[in-house]
Amino acid sequence: KVLLAKALFGKPDVLLLDEPTNGLDIQSISWLEDFLIDFENTVIVVSHDRHFLNKVCTHMADLDFGKIKLYVGNYDFWKQSSELAARLQADRNAKAEEKIKELQEFVARFSANASKSKQATSRKKMLDKIELEEIVPSSRKYPFINFKAERELGKDLLTVENLSVKIDGETVLDNISFILRPGDKTAFIGQNDIQTTALMRALMDDIEYEGTIKWGVTTSRSYLPKDNSRDFSSGESILEWLRQFASKEEDDNTFLRGFLGRMLFSGDEVNKSVSVLSGGEKVRVMLSKLMLLKSNVLVLDDPTNHLDLESITALNDGLMAFTGSLL
């Protein structure tokens, strides 16, 4: 918020924002959206928040294939337009390939036939004029995120009674109670992320609290914290760090390398120290850990933070398909 205030102060001619919604709560993002919509000058923004892009942006600059292309419209319009263009290009190539095959068969069949030689020559000229459009593979890559629960949930998930949490002497959660049922996928929202993070930490016994938190006896929980710095304080490689969460059957270099490859860590990248990973890489490593643990309850505190749009899409798909409970 302080950095945003600094950038916005003085009404600049051009406002450059790199991931401005990272770390902001819902109310702050909504305020920023309204501010930018009314902002009269130029705004150039990099963001992985597609809802923010849809609401604020009038143009999309698509950087892919090593080139940049400008679209008029918001994120959804760009996505639909680019996907339609790719489908049309593929359809044109498919029709061209079909025509090439047809002409090649005619030339091969009748080129030695005197009565058909002129037609064969004509077809050969037509064949030489047909060109396939080059379809360059996208530079965008999607990780494979698939959460499986080793054990089904029983009849109870979570009961919270009279929960209170203080941070530095200030009450952030005051006497709250709720019950969640097996299979529930629950989003927690609040006035600020201090409250929701305090709740997540209390549920995972990662902070002192007053009150009662009772998990069902059949639950097994995996936690993705907002602040994962403690998880990556060692100098271990990605491969060795992840190995500690693998089962005996999975504790194999071939398996772990393949597993990490699906999470976009290929080749020697698995030997990188976890302490030097970027924010997005750390979240992908944490998600890899959660997949290996196979818990039936996932507790995720702002899991899309630092992830790119491709990883967010893959995470969305993985969470929708997850048969356990989600907080």
Positions of PLM-derived features:
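ABC ATP-binding cassette signature C-motif
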Residues: 1-91, 150-327
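Flexible nucleotide-interacting loop at or near the entrance of a catalytic core
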Residues: 84-172
